[in-house]
A protein has these predicted regions:
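Sigma70-family region 2
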Residues: 11-12, 51-65, 87
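Short, charged helix-capping/linker segments at alpha-helix termini
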Residues: 11-19, 30-49
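N-terminal module of bacterial RNA polymerase sigma factors
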Residues: 1-27
Length: 95
């Protein structure tokens, strides 16, 4: 299925299109997140958060500005940064 039509379906609220996109990108995104944070279970949780955020914010995606994968990575980087800030804060409280 062509990505353009999947994105349109996703913007229209089609859960099947979302599922297809999720299956298409989840492993690649999981590898990216794991590379950044070096924790497998946390990476899996963050990937879920990323896809939730993408689902909620799909209306902000503009195909003329970037690829969908770059949109995913942009959301991933925001979630990873938030995760890192929380981790640093937790580590400082423990010390």
């Amino acid at each position: 299925m062509e990505e353009h039509s999947l994105i349109k379906g996703l913007k229209d609220g089609d859960n099947e299109d979302f599922r297809y996109i999720y299956e298409k990108y989840k492993e690649k995104l999981n590898s990216y997140v794991y590379y950044k944070i070096k924790n497998k279970s946390e990476a899996e949780d963050l990937v879920q958060e990323i896809f939730t955020k993408v689902y909620k914010n799909i209306g902000l995606y503009d195909e003329t500005q970037s690829t969908f994968y770059n949109f995913l990575l942009s959301n991933a980087n925001q979630i990873i940064a938030e995760y890192s800030r929380k981790n640093i804060s937790r580590e400082q409280k423990v010390e």
